[in-house]
From Swiss-Prot:
<comment type="pathway">
    <text>Amino-acid biosynthesis; L-tryptophan biosynthesis; L-tryptophan from chorismate: step 4/5.</text>
</comment>
<keyword id="KW-0210">Decarboxylase</keyword>
<dbReference type="Pfam" id="PF00218">
    <property type="entry name" value="IGPS"/>
</dbReference>
<comment type="similarity">
    <text>Belongs to the TrpC family.</text>
</comment>
<dbReference type="InterPro" id="IPR013785">
    <property type="entry name" value="Aldolase_TIM"/>
</dbReference>
<protein>
    <recommendedName>
        <fullName>Indole-3-glycerol phosphate synthase</fullName>
        <ecNumber>4.1.1.48</ecNumber>
    </recommendedName>
</protein>
<keyword id="KW-0456">Lyase</keyword>
<keyword id="KW-0057">Aromatic amino acid biosynthesis</keyword>
<dbReference type="GO" id="GO:0000162">
    <property type="term" value="P:L-tryptophan biosynthetic process"/>
</dbReference>
<keyword id="KW-0822">Tryptophan biosynthesis</keyword>
<dbReference type="InterPro" id="IPR001468">
    <property type="entry name" value="Indole-3-GlycerolPSynthase_CS"/>
</dbReference>
<dbReference type="GO" id="GO:0004640">
    <property type="term" value="F:phosphoribosylanthranilate isomerase activity"/>
</dbReference>
<dbReference type="InterPro" id="IPR013798">
    <property type="entry name" value="Indole-3-glycerol_P_synth_dom"/>
</dbReference>
<dbReference type="InterPro" id="IPR045186">
    <property type="entry name" value="Indole-3-glycerol_P_synth"/>
</dbReference>
<dbReference type="InterPro" id="IPR011060">
    <property type="entry name" value="RibuloseP-bd_barrel"/>
</dbReference>
<dbReference type="GO" id="GO:0004425">
    <property type="term" value="F:indole-3-glycerol-phosphate synthase activity"/>
</dbReference>
<keyword id="KW-0028">Amino-acid biosynthesis</keyword>
Length: 263
C-alpha cells in the first residue's frame, strides 16, 4: 500500500470507530434497509452502452489532495441536475472530508434532486461504511484493491450485494486486476492515476482493458478531459467513464458534459 493510502486508512479507521460509537452497526443497518429504494447502478450504465452511447459516471467533487480546491462555487444539488441534463448515466459523490472536502450531506442532497443512481466515492475499510452508504441513499460503493486485501474486498462486495447495491472494483495494475476479477462484481474501474506518483496516463486503460472478460463493464477513471480521450478509450473497448475534475472546472457543467460525451 502506498504512503498516501496508509495515511488515509489511519484516519478512516478512526472515523469508522467514532461513527460506530455514535450509531451502532445494527442501528445503521436498520437505517440502510429503511432507506429510499436502490436505483440500479450497473443497469444504468448498461442501458447507455446498449444504446451506443458512452456511459458517464459524473463526479461531484469540491477538492482533491493533488489539486486542492477544484470548484469554489460548489452546490451539489445544482451540479447533480446539470449532470443529469448533460446526459450522465450515474453520479459519483465524494463523502471523504479530510482529503476531498466531501460530506455525506452532499450525497443526500444531490441524490434527492435527480433520478440517477449514485456512487458513494470514498475509501472503504469496514462493512460498517457500506451500511452507512446505503443509509444515506447510495446505490453503489467503490472497492479500491490497492487499499484492501482480498478478504476485506470480498466482505465489502458481499455487504453491498446484501443491500442490493452494486460495487465498482478499482484497479491500477495487472496484479490488482487479477484479484478484482475473482470478486463477484460486474463493474471494473481502471484508474489511470499512479498512486505513488499521482501521474495519469490513458495507456493504463489501454493495457488493462483487453484483459477484462466481455461480461464485465470496464470504467475508465482519471485523466479523461476531452472527447478525444473518450474516443481513445472506446477504441480499447471502454464504453463507460468516471469524470470529475475536468467537468467541475467548467462554468457551464451541462454544456461541458454534452461536449465531453458527444464532441
Amino acid at each position: 500500500m502506498s504512503d498516501i493510502l496508509s495515511r488515509i486508512e489511519t484516519y478512516k479507521r478512526a472515523e469508522i470507530e467514532a461513527a460506530r460509537a455514535a450509531r451502532p452497526q445494527a442501528e445503521t443497518e436498520a437505517a440502510a434497509r429503511a432507506a429510499d429504494p436502490v436505483r440500479p447502478f450497473a443497469k444504468a450504465l448498461e442501458a447507455k452502452i446498449a444504446a451506443g452511447q458512452t456511459a458517464l459516471i459524473a463526479e461531484i467533487k469540491k477538492a482533491s489532495p493533488s489539486k486542492g480546491l477544484i470548484r469554489p462555487d460548489f452546490d451539489p444539488p445544482v451540479l447533480a441536475r446539470a449532470y443529469e441534463d448533460g446526459g450522465a448515466a450515474c453520479l459519483s459523490i465524494l463523502t471523504d472530508g479530510p482529503s476531498f472536502q466531501g460530506a455525506p450531506e452532499y450525497l443526500i442532497a444531490a441524490r434527492a434532486q435527480v433520478s440517477l443512481p449514485v456512487l458513494r466515492k470514498d475509501f472503504l475499510f469496514d462493512t460498517y461504511q457500506v451500511a452507512e452508504a446505503r443509509a444515506w441513499g447510495a446505490d453503489c460503493i467503490l472497492v479500491i484493491m490497492a487499499a484492501v486485501d482480498d478478504a476485506l474486498a470480498r466482505d465489502l462486495v458481499e455487504a453491498a450485494t446484501d443491500f442490493g447495491m452494486d460495487s465498482i472494483i478499482e484497479v491500477h495494475d495487472e496484479a490488482e486486476l487479477d484479484r478484482a476479477l475473482a470478486l463477484p462484481s460486474k463493474l471494473i474501474g481502471i484508474n489511470n492515476r499512479n498512486l505513488r506518483t499521482f501521474e495519469t496516463t490513458l495507456a493504463t486503460s489501454g493495457r488493462l482493458a483487453p484483459r477484462v472478460p466481455k461480461d464485465r463493464i470496464v470504467i475508465g477513471e482519471s485523466g479523461i478531459f476531452t472527447h478525444a480521450d473518450v474516443k481513445l478509450l472506446r477504441q480499447v473497448g471502454i464504453a463507460s467513464i468516471l469524470v470529475g475534475e475536468s467537468l467541475m472546472r467548467q462554468e457551464d457543467v451541462t454544456s461541458a458534459t454534452r461536449t465531453l460525451l458527444n464532441g
